[in-house]
Amino acid sequence: MSDALQRRTGSDYIEVGATLLAAAAEGQAGLAATIVSPPTLVLGSAQSATDAATGADVVRRGTGGGAVFCDEGVLLIDLAVPAGHALAPEDVTEAYRPLGEAVQHALAGLGVDCRTVGVEEARAMDDARKAAARRACWAGLSPYEVVLGDGRKLVGLAQRRRRGAVLHQVAIPVTTPPAEVLSHLVEGALLAQWLQETAMVASVAGCGSATPVGTWDVLREPLNALLRP
């Protein structure tokens, strides 16, 4: 599968992850980058379909967490690796570390003042915020996700494991505000206070690469390097 940035429907995006995961189970690491059209609400694997409001296509991804609203302003990245790879240690949390650090370093090259989330920082979320994160990805924090220096969330990470392989998924709002998801969730306004703690690359980058294409140009080689044995 090509690692060139591709425009895909929501359903095709879901299929990309499944295809990469199956290939990884056979020993082949892979990488794909996507922008979604038409706009689609992507639910987490265990999220209730009743969370979705009308007005956009709805699909369900294989990784957990809350919903992400995806359109041509959100960069989606899938990486899949076989068991035994550096991105597939037994410790699920630590599997995120090299990926989060690579994304953080690349975004810093765009002039973004950002850092990765510490394990204890993520665990310190109160119950109300944890509940919000089960509905909207951007409402919560997970270890090694990328946030700005002031703590606003910039990059979401998720992971799916099957026998012999691990799929990592990355979501980066480049020109679409993360809070756009609120319009596509039932009673989404109730989550607004947590979505204020988010940002998009276009509003914080210090150079002209703050488009999905430009952002992928910066991330493509570092992420390919992660896949190499």
Please give the residue ranges for each predicted region:
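Active-site loop/lid in soluble adenylation, ligation, and acyl-transfer enzymes
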Residues: M1-T54, R60-R61, G84, K130-C137, ...
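Short acidic-glycine loop/turn motifs at beta-strand connectors
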Residues: S37, E72, L148-G151, R162-R163
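Short, structured patches in soluble enzyme cores that scaffold and shape functional sites
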Residues: S45, L79-A83, V103, A158, ...
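A glycine-rich, hydrophobic loop/mini-helix early in the fold
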Residues: Q47-D91, P98
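Internal, conserved structured core segments that host functional sites
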Residues: D78-A136, P143
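Long, positively charged amphipathic alpha-helical accessory segments at protein N-termini or as interdomain linkers
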Residues: Q104-A132, R160-P229
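Aromatic/basic-lined ligand-recognition segments
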Residues: R134-V147, G151-A158
